[in-house]
Amino acid sequence: MSDITAVLLAAGHGTRMKSDLIKVMHPLAGKPMIGHIVDNVRRAGLEDIVVVVGYQQERIREYLGDRVRYAVQSEQLGTGHAVLQAAGLIDETEGGHVLVMYGDNPFIGPELIERLIRAHVEADAAASLLTAELADPGALGRILRDPATGAFLGSVEYKDATPEQRRIREIWTGVAVFRRAGFTALLNRLDRNNAQGEYYLPQVWEILLQRGEKVQALLLASEEDALAPNDRVELARAEARLRRQINERHMRNGVTIINPDATYIDEDVEIGRDTVIWPFTFIHGKTVIGPHCKIGPMTTIVSSTVAEGCVVEQSVVEESYVGPGCRIGPMAHLRPGCELEGAAEIGNYAELKKAKVGRGVKCHHHSYLGDATIGAGANIGAGTITANYNGVEKFRTEIGSGAFIGTNVNLIAPITVGDGALIAAGSTVGPRLEIPADALVVERAQAVIKEGRAASLKEAWRQRKMNREGT
């Protein structure tokens, strides 16, 4: 739809949120509200998007980047004034239309946007609005219709409405399409002769109606589609609905979610068929999970790729790649930058960071592997530590294929362990050591036994404590 410019209004503070963060940047299902709006507009086929920013505009610009163009509303003087700030970015010489949307209505999806635009074009209307009937419309403006025909007659802001008009339940959702030609001239005719002293965008269709031009209002089938969170209660409602929609989409695509009410999956997550998600699992960011996996329970995965046939149980995976057939957990932690090839096993209380792990590696218990490369088939014994940090710099550990690292081994980086080498349990080796392939490394201190010394040593400790305490 190259002949349509979308103008998204995102300049307001959102004071009812009672937050230091601008309302449109509050997250829903892992994505700021304005992100949902931009994505919905793009999925509807619109490429030319202008976002009107003001309060905390730097946050919005940082998030959206160059995906959109920007207009600035320095002073908050109403919705009509906000759209006017974008007028200079709308080319009226080529005809077409302008879509206006508030930046906080995430459930106006691409299908609804397409439906409104199609109805607008087919009717050759000057303006087309999307409306909804709410059980409790509160202080929102009301839509006025002819009681006999249902024809759209206009709208009235709540503060300007009569008691009878306030009983109307139909409201404008903040979404409208206008004919592009002459749109700026209409905006320049707006005035502030109302209770709030603001430039109302709805005055545009009042002007059009006075001129005898066609303005239509399309009513949404569901009140829930009009949900635009204004406070934390409504934000929680929106979050619950969006997550329910996300979970249902995955289930219809062949994913088993044992308890959808206790599973939290972000909007941009992809999951393959026949994967099973157990309760209390959180999957965030742009995570991709392959088919035939078992995820959870009590697992968190953030912006990672988990390939086919993996098991991730009671563990945390952050910004990492987990190859086919890997087993993670329970209680393992993959910190950012890990790459696991196929069939690796990372077990209880193991922690990895920036670790490249070869195929078939086993690291089952209480180990830390940081800034390390572990070759295929290596075995990492319980309690193995790569000491990679000296307080100033990080150093790498290289462990060759088929190497065997015994329990409670400290590898002081930088260190290289050759293919097939064996390091005996309890050894502390390195730094700057290169262990040859197939070598055996045993690091031991000779045990010293002093019979009867324990009692005298304990007595000395007691005396020292008494002297220190002055008793």
From Swiss-Prot:
GO terms for biological process: cell morphogenesis; cell wall organization; lipid A biosynthetic process; peptidoglycan biosynthetic process; regulation of cell shape; UDP-N-acetylglucosamine biosynthetic process. Binds 1 Mg(2+) ion per subunit. Its cofactor is Mg(2+). Pfam families: Hexapep, NTP_transf_3. Residues 1-232 are annotated as: Pyrophosphorylase. The keyword Metal-binding applies. UDP-N-acetyl-alpha-D-glucosamine binds at residues 9-12, 23, 73, 78-79, 102-104, 141, 157, 230, 335, 353, 368, 379. Gene3D superfamilies: Hexapeptide repeat proteins, Spore Coat Polysaccharide Biosynthesis Protein SpsA, Chain A. It comes from the Bacteria. One of its GO terms (molecular function) is UDP-N-acetylglucosamine diphosphorylase activity. It catalyses: alpha-D-glucosamine 1-phosphate + acetyl-CoA = N-acetyl-alpha-D-glucosamine 1-phosphate + CoA + H(+); N-acetyl-alpha-D-glucosamine 1-phosphate + UTP + H(+) = UDP-N-acetyl-alpha-D-glucosamine + diphosphate. PROSITE patterns: HEXAPEP_TRANSFERASES. One of its GO terms (cellular component) is membrane. Residues 254-471 are annotated as: N-acetyltransferase. Residues 233-253 are annotated as: Linker. Its EC number is 2.7.7.23, 2.3.1.157. Keywords: Acyltransferase, Cell shape, Cell wall biogenesis/degradation, Cytoplasm, Magnesium, Metal-binding, Multifunctional enzyme, Nucleotidyltransferase, Peptidoglycan synthesis, Repeat, Transferase. It is found in: Cytoplasm. Pathway: Nucleotide-sugar biosynthesis; UDP-N-acetyl-alpha-D-glucosamine biosynthesis; N-acetyl-alpha-D-glucosamine 1-phosphate from alpha-D-glucosamine 6-phosphate (route II): step 2/2; Nucleotide-sugar biosynthesis; UDP-N-acetyl-alpha-D-glucosamine biosynthesis; UDP-N-acetyl-alpha-D-glucosamine from N-acetyl-alpha-D-glucosamine 1-phosphate: step 1/1; Bacterial outer membrane biogenesis; LPS lipid A biosynthesis. It is an enzyme of class 2 (transferase). In the N-terminal section; belongs to the N-acetylglucosamine-1-phosphate uridyltransferase family. PANTHER family: BIFUNCTIONAL PROTEIN GLMU, NUCLEOTIDYL TRANSFERASE. This is Bifunctional protein GlmU. It comes from Symbiobacterium thermophilum (strain DSM 24528 / JCM 14929 / IAM 14863 / T). The gene is glmU.
